[in-house]
Structures are given as C-alpha cells and as structure tokens.
A protein has these predicted regions:
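A short, well-ordered alpha-helix in the C-terminal region of glycosyltransferases
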Residues: 310, 317, 324-338, 347-350
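Short His-centered aromatic/hydrophobic patch
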Residues: 87-94, 111
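Conserved acidic donor-binding segment of nucleotide-sugar-dependent glycosyltransferases
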Residues: 297-298, 302-309, 317-322
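Acidic anion/phosphate-binding donor-loop and adjacent secondary structure
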Residues: 64-68, 148-153, 163-181
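N-terminal strand-loop element at the rim of the active site
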Residues: 5-67, 161, 223
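Aromatic "clamp/platform" in nucleotide-sugar-dependent glycosyltransferases that forms part
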Residues: 246, 265
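Short hydrophobic beta-strand element within catalytic cores of glycosyltransferases
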Residues: 282-285, 295
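A conserved mid-protein helix/loop that constitutes part of the nucleotide-sugar donor-binding site
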Residues: 13-24, 183, 187-206, 223-229
Length: 359
C-alpha cells in the first residue's frame, strides 16, 4: 500500500515525532510512504528522515491562509497516486480538498489533542465537521478521552482509537534508582501555554531547602522560553534551572534523569510520556486528556492537577523514596509495550484497509 502523510513541517513536537515514528514503522511493514511538508523549513527531524531514505516533498507554503497549497497538493496526489492520505494538525484544511480533486483519495486524520483545541477556531471546526460527516476524512483519536471529545464535539458515532507509539528500542532503560549528589528533574516540551512551564517553575521553587540539591532540566524551545528564563530568575531558582533547547535525541537525557515531569494544562497522548515510560522513569503528570489512559495513577506514575503545590508534593514523594521511584519506573517500563511504533502502524494499516475497501 502507498501512504502519503501530510504535515505542516517537522518542528520538535509530539505530532511531528509521531509522524516520523509512524513513517518508519509503516515502511518496516513493507509499505511505500511519502511525506509532504507544507513549509519549506528543514529541521533535524526532516534531515534524519531523509538520511534514513524517506522521501519528503516540500510545498513552500506562505505564512497564514494560503489556498495555493490546494492545487499544489492536488498535483502531488495525482503524481504519487497514494492509496491513502494521512493528515496531521491543520493541514486537513488543504489536504482533504486536494484529495477530492485528485479523485477522491481516502483520508485519515489523526486528532492530536482534545477536539476543541485541535480545531483551532470556529471556521476550522465547521470545516472538519463537514469533512467528517461527508466521509471525506476519518478522524482517529489518540486515546479514549480524546475520542470522547471528538464524538461529542463533532456529533460522530464512530471514531477509532489508535494509541501513539514510539520505537522502544531507542529507549535506554534505567538500571538504578538511587540518587546522586544532584537530583535531576526533567521536562520535555515546547514553551507554550499548554505545557504550563510557569506552574512547573513554581512547583520547583516550592521544594524545601532540604532538597536544595535538585536541578530542573528543560528541553524544548518556543515563544515563551525567554519569558520563562526571566521568571526562573525572579523565583530565585535560575541557578538550578537549565534551559537546554531542542535536542535531536532526548533519550540520553531521559536515561540520566531521576524523574520526568509533565504538568500540562491539556494533552492528547504525549509522546514524551511514552519515551519516559520506555526508559523506566518515575513520572509526575497532570490528569488531563489521554494521560490517565497511559499511566495507572499510583502504580505506574503519579497523577496530579496543575496546582504547583500538588506537583511539588508528588516530586517530594519521589525524592524521598527509592522504593517508590523503582516501583513506578518499572511498572511504567512494563506498560510501555502497549505503545510501540509497530503496534501503532499495524492499527493504522487496519484503518487504511477498511477505507480502501469501501472506495
């Protein structure tokens, strides 16, 4: 089968990482996969994919609404003649139109967040609803909670759930849960409102002086980074918070950390949590979106609200108990098998085959 994936571009983010993982896994299953990036920007992820032999076609999209993308995509679809078009994020606006113009190619759209957030406004929500109800695109939810929001928001009866997956072989499982002279807390994510960096910094600042040997490593970049660097200094923790930027390979940072924190305001199914699980890291995460479908509260992770005091208390529990760190980490490692890239790819293939059989 030939699958054509369409994505805005390969910045560092969960949807982009999922698209990369799915592309490799589909190819390993014997499928022909081509990727279209709307923007011309090359990144470490796109470079890595091209080095691995993945063909990426770039459209040089202009910022904002650019309807010239539709005929460009239509031309590519006619040239490539895919069996299925798989869209991510807001490319659904252009790609489904192009798929219809190119002969009615079946489309699958991964909903990477709760429905209202993922739609990015009323106009996009109306268009998505039209596409879904006409059967021009089939939404796939990342978790039961995301599925619930999609069925309610769009008034749909059938929304399949396919968990995100990662290449678990790239994870480096922890062997020891003892603490060194410095206790390393890790967060990975874009600096935007969703990831709640301000709340995370407040939680870290609340750790008592008995835990003054802690450091907080923040991987990622984004429009709020400079503001958060300033905020860390204002909270008096600038010396202990390390802003490390985007990293092409996060696995060594996960392996070297003592715990992973993700107190987001909302989520779909965070790839970073799967990678932390595959490393056997004890995890503190907010009880939002698909996170409770991934972590068993108190057994494979500590689930909290977004309140800094609650997040801080969970961190203290982990710092104070090697037994708890080991139990949560090992249970998370065992549970990570549910989220392999191969399993994800096989489930998507089932959906592709269902759609192509109906055509």
């Amino acid at each position: 089968m030939k699958i054509l994936q369409v994505i805005p571009y390969f910045c560092f983010g969960g949807a982009e990482t999922m698209c990369e993982n799915l592309t490799y896994a589909l190819r390993d299953l014997g499928h022909d996969v081509v990727v279209v990036s709307l923007f011309d920007e090359r990144t470490e992820i796109s470079g890595r994919m091209e080095a691995a032999g993945i063909r990426i076609r770039y459209l040089c999209k202009k910022p904002g609404l650019d309807m010239s993308v539709v005929p460009k995509l239509t031309k590519i679809f006619r040239e490539e003649r895919p069996d299925v078009v798989h869209t991510h994020l807001n490319v659904i606006l252009y790609a489904v139109m192009a798929a219809r113009l190119a002969g009615g190619i079946p489309c699958v759209h991964t909903v990477h967040n709760v429905a209202k957030v993922e739609a990015e406004g009323t106009a996009q929500a109306i268009l998505n609803r039209f596409y879904y109800h006409r059967g021009w695109s089939v939404p796939v939810a990342l978790s039961p909670e995301v599925q619930r929001t999609v069925t309610e928001f769009y008034g749909l009866d059938r929304v399949p759930v396919i968990f995100n997956g990662v290449n678990l072989h790239r994870c480096i499982p922890k062997r020891s849960y003892g603490l060194g002279d410095t206790v390393s807390l890790l967060h990975i994510g874009r600096f935007d409102e969703q990831k709640n960096h301000a709340g995370l910094l407040q939680a870290f600042a609340k750790l008592p002086k008995t835990h003054s040997n802690c450091c907080l490593n923040l991987l990622g970049d984004g429009h709020l980074r400079t503001e958060m660097e300033k905020y860390a200094r204002e909270l008096g923790i600038g010396h202990a918070v390390h802003f490390l930027g985007n990293q092409a390979d996060v696995h060594p940072y996960l392996h070297d950390a003592d715990m992973f924190l993700l107190p987001s305001k909302y989520e779909g199914m965070p790839m970073t949590i799967i990678e932390a699980m595959g490393t056997g890291l004890p995890i503190v995460a907010s009880r939002v979106g698909g996170v409770p479908d991934m972590l068993r509260g108190g057994e494979s992770g500590l689930l909290t609200g977004c309140d800094p005091g609650e997040v801080c208390a969970a961190c203290e529990k982990l710092i104070d108990s090697e037994e708890l760190r080991r139990t949560l980490g090992q249970n998370a490692l065992a549970d990570s098998a549910r989220f392999s890239a191969e399993t994800m790819a096989k489930r998507y293939c089932e959906e592709y085959e269902r759609l192509t059989a109906k055509k």
